[in-house]
Amino acid sequence: MVLHYPGGIDLTEFGIQIPVAPDRTAQVLTALRDDPKIGPREARWLLGPDGSEIEQEDLLRVHAPEYVARGFGDGVEGLMLEVFELVNADGSYHRYDPDSARRSLAELFADWRRWMAGTYQCGSEALRHGFCFYLGGGAHHGHYDFGHGFCVFNDIVTAIRRHQAEGSVRTAWVIDVDAHKGDGTAALTADDESIVTLSIHMGRSWPLDLPDHRPDGSPTPWFIPSTVEIPIEPGGEGEYLRRLDEGLALLDAYPRPDLVYVVDGADPYEHDGLPSTADLQLNLEALLARDQRISSFLDERELPQAWLMSGGYGTRAWEPFAQFLRWRLGGG
């Protein structure tokens, strides 16, 4: 199943100039609809919103009350400026032109909550059907009391904890193959034995090039390791798939999960448009092998798998997602 929330989030509407192609989901859908085997079966694999919503109580299972309150009060615009890193230290704007905005940052927060609901629904569909790919989700840089890297709240942990509260899930895995370390997910679940995390990521790039201590001397949380941590050094593309296989094998030592979220970032792609992904340059063949290995690993163990788009920037970001879904849906 493929889950699509029409509209999505177009950052340019808010004056934000981060290079996320607003039409990457549309391009994926076009590629699937144009496939001679997949297109005629659209009614069997394409899903829309089921009305799920993310409420304050869902966020409070994961995030600090004072942080959640900022999103629902007068501090929402300041929150969005911080999380999307739109203001430099000297007060000037960074990748942000408020004069070009057609919608307010408060509206972006409302869109974000709607976007998060898709991650929860994706998990529900995976529990029902065995597989679901959400054309959205994957905000793995959301931390307990702050967000960075364009991630306001952590939709992955929020969805898992809601499923746990509802009794549909006891244990879960998160397999994160985005180019950037899933630092928020690792930090939020570090003391939670019910959630096992794997992250394979650039070993020296953002957020791992940020300071390891705050001005007050306390450690910063982005260095907290995932349960299975796989840093790839610059130039390590040739060992990527082998190290992924080794990491997946380690998961078998942990309790069998009721649900697996896969954070399927396309930003390791050699044609990605975000400068901070330059240390990991995989071609389409390697990215397809990555996704096939994860999907087959989970299929062999009959584990429900909920896939999230996560990172992927520039005009070609849709290509890795489309090729995997063509394979998964039995395309020509």
Question: Where are the model-predicted features located?
Answer:
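HDAC/HDAC-like amidohydrolase catalytic core signature
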Residues: M1-G332
